[in-house]
């Protein structure tokens, strides 16, 4: 019966199959902190976020760039100790430039804590970056391979990251990744550093990289995707990257990050679940986003999907009436879907009927009944009239006062 109530064009003939692997890397505590408008939180807040990432089944977390200074290294060490002492399933990685002085702090923390850290070694790869820096391709190859060999020689797994991959020449990508495989990289990361890529471009570059790795004897080498939101395409590009062969994609809480931010890892989790690509309990999603908001001093927009205040609220008469009818049928499944493309209960939320100037009397009656107040004709009329005269939704306290 339920299958007949919604025709889902998203999964009709030709829908992409589930990727062979679906892994997530949370960049909130590294790239997220590069946002110009957030605060680097104290270590207790970082620990809380790490635990919530773990609850959501996120595979890896980038816990910082320890080469940035003593505090950064101390925080990375503290988070590694938290992973060990709390026996968290989430694994750690850290960013570093392709220079020894950035790699050494990662080695030190690993040796002190006994916690393996994947070293995410990054270097620019696009011609525009090469021109600005005065680099040639030989420099990129030498800098990359020496850094990878040094990290691997000191017991680190390496994710080799080419910044600005989505604007790099094919021959440069081919050479850098081929040499990275030979030097011992375990994974590579295709980075859309400036948020330049479209979904088609994402699929093309990820598919190209897969071919390069296979030709270099790196069929076992996994591909990461790291995207930004400068064109508003961060989230959809993550899905395109999975379709094209990436096995791990990056994101941040609430999409925070450099400039316009990174792909929203919270919304990525939602979409992966709705696509059927993951199956896990995501009811901690609200707690995760609230914790990130409080730690980083970044408010959650009211209209933010799923976790924003407005996501599952309505005061519009026609919409509310349909939801109320579903509730009166005793069908929570129906109420969760009749005016929502995202089932609230799957993510720890519920539908909420509000009262405002566009409401009908059914909104008022439902609010009264759900708050244990008998909806007399006079009371309904009093609240309904007040709502029509208001220029916004009435808060619960105002409605309670009208109940007298």
Q: Which residues make up each language-model segment?
A:
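N-terminal capping/small domains of soluble enzymes
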Residues: 1-98, 355, 359, 370, ...
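Short glycine-rich loop/turn motifs that provide flexible caps or phosphate-binding loops at active sites
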Residues: 31, 63, 123, 194, ...
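Catalytic alpha/beta core domains of metabolic enzymes, predominantly
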Residues: 197-330
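A mid-to-C-terminal "edge-of-domain" accessory segment
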Residues: 1-30, 278-404
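Short, ordered loop/turn segments at secondary-structure junctions
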Residues: 29, 65-66, 95-98, 122-126, ...
């Amino acid at each position: 019966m339920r299958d007949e109530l919604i025709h889902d064009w998203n999964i009709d003939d030709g829908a992409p199959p589930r990727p062979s692997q679906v892994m997530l890397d949370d960049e909130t505590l590294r790239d997220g902190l590069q946002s110009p408008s957030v605060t680097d939180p104290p270590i207790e807040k970082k620990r809380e976020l790490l635990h919530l990432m773990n609850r959501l089944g996120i595979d890896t977390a980038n816990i910082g760039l320890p080469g940035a200074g003593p505090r950064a290294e101390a925080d990375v060490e503290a988070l590694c100790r938290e992973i060990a002492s709390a026996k968290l399933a989430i694994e750690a990685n850290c960013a570093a430039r392709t220079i020894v002085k950035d790699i050494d702090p990662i080695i030190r923390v690993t040796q002190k804590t006994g916690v393996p850290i994947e070293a995410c070694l990054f270097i620019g790869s696009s011609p525009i970056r090469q021109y600005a820096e005065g680099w040639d391709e030989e420099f990129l190859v030498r800098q990359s391979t020496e850094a990878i060999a040094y990290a691997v020689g000191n017991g680190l797994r390496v994710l080799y990251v080419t910044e600005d991959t989505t604007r790099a020449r094919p021959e440069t990508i081919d050479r850098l990744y081929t040499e990275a495989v030979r030097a011992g990289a375990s994974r590579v990361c295709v980075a859309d550093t400036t948020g330049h890529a479209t979904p088609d471009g994402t699929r093309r570059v990820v598919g190209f990289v897969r071919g390069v790795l296979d030709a270099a004897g790196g069929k076992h080498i996994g591909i990461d995707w790291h995207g930004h939101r400068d064109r508003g395409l961060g989230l959809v590009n993550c899905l395109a990257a999975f379709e094209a062969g990436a096995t791990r994609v990056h994101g941040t809480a609430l999409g925070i990050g450099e400039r316009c931010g990174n792909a929203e890892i919270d919304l990525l989790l939602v979409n992966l679940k709705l696509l059927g690509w993951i199956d896990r309990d995501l009811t901690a999603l609200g707690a995760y986003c609230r914790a990130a908001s409080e730690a980083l001093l970044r408010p959650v927009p009211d209209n933010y999907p799923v976790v924003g205040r407005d996501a599952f609220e309505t005061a519009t008469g026609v919409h509310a009436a349909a939801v109320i009818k579903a509730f009166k049928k005793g069908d929570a499944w129906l109420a969760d879907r009749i005016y929502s493309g995202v089932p609230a209960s799957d993510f720890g939320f519920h539908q909420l009927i509000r009262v405002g100037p566009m409401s009908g009397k059914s909104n008022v009656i439902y609010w009264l009944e759900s708050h244990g107040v008998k909806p007399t004709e006079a009371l309904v009329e009093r609240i309904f009239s007040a709502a029509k005269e208001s220029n916004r939704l009435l808060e619960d306290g105002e409605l309670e006062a009208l109940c007298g």
